């Protein structure tokens, strides 16, 4: 099955990678430069089932709310406040998305405006998922079913239009909250990046389109650009 990384387009990928590397306590590494790209992408590999993050150079401006955002977990109220204080010290800002005062999570934006939440302690859904507990996405049930099959990750939640999947080894959950969705806006500044198993990109494209993806184009870096059943672009690398 393909390996999943979450890619962020960024005006300053090195700075954004430093923010997330420090917040997540990870070691950044430079990706090899693809053809036509002059600024390096930076990868924050995940371990023990935690999603990896990739930051790629782009001049595209952020428009509206992202269709996916990260959830960081907390072990106590004090731990939640420490995470928030650390994030603010690194350049994050508080964000009002209409959350109610009685809700325990804290909504922040990273230095390029990407939303993320620091979840309150005692959240049973994210118990045992690790510090990067969840990637929360917009999307109907068919999107979750597609990604479950595409990644070989079983459904761990399937209620109404809400779905969630998790690697068989545990770790970060990927969840879709059902409608209403935020509008799909191109170009897609956040996306799933997949690495084809064994480097066989052509065979993997065939498998993914057979599951319901749509072929879009070949990118300049040699990756295949596809669209999932929810209209979200993703890339498949060799």
Specify the residue positions occupied by each region the protein language model found.
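Glyoxalase I/VOC metalloenzyme domain signal
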Residues: 1-33, 37-39, 43-96, 109-160, ...
